[in-house]
Amino acid sequence: MRSDGRNPASLRNIRITRKYLKHAEGSVLVEFGDTKVLCTASVEESVPPFLRGKGGGWVTAEYSMLPRATHTRSPREAAKGKLGGRTHEIQRLIGRSLRAVTDLTLLGERSVLIDCDVLQADGGTRTASITGAYVALVDAFQWLVSQGTIATLPVREAVAAVSVGIVGGEVLLDLNYIEDSRADVDMNFVMTSSGRFVEVQGTAEAEPFTCAQMDDMRSLAMIGIERLMAIQQEVLEQ
């Protein structure tokens, strides 16, 4: 039994609340247990300079944590004058994951900017951000269709992400902070609804892991992502 009472193959309580903000074209509050992330999707009628005149659009992301999202206050990165390496890595991952399932040609020469702001962190903020940002992105696309700006949703398939790890010799799904801090191995999987991988991140903190252990983690991640996508679909149909 895990610290929060789950079995090894259980996700935390997952909740995705759509239309959380008034002004954004797409917005959700995504909750993975005690991890809470506000994801917004904003439409801009322009593209980066390297895409001008090419007929395609762009999807990009920014990620940040509120100063008191964690146990002790962390200074705002804006106050430091630069983004940290972890922030750069995570926001690039979110952007890549969403572009992997978007037909940028159908979007036309416009951009969707995703903002993922961590309100409360208890492990898995990047996986929660990707899972929630997908729903916010679809809502922004649906808004564009409703305005007659684009003819069809430029979404090829769904995308979601989850963490897995080895803690005390046991493979666990969707690690919380306590589990993540004790993990011998920590992995993040980003997958599409067709069962393809967008990204796999894995690190051995102590003992290196075997192919068999990696297969076990992959299998558990695939089960978790299938459940997450069912939740995404259910929420989008409401």
UniProtKB/Swiss-Prot annotation:
KW Nucleus (keyword) present: no
InterPro entries named among the record's database cross-references: ExoRNase_PH_dom1, ExoRNase_PH_dom2, ExoRNase_PH_dom2_sf, PNPase/RNase_PH_dom_sf, Ribosomal_Su5_D2-typ_SF, RNase_PH, RNase_PH_bac-type, RNase_PH_CS
Name assigned to this protein: Ribonuclease PH
Originating organism: Geobacter sulfurreducens (strain ATCC 51573 / DSM 12127 / PCA)
Top class in the EC scheme: transferase
HAMAP family: RNase_PH
NCBIfam families documented for this protein: RNasePH (TIGR01966)
Binding site for phosphate: 86, 124-126
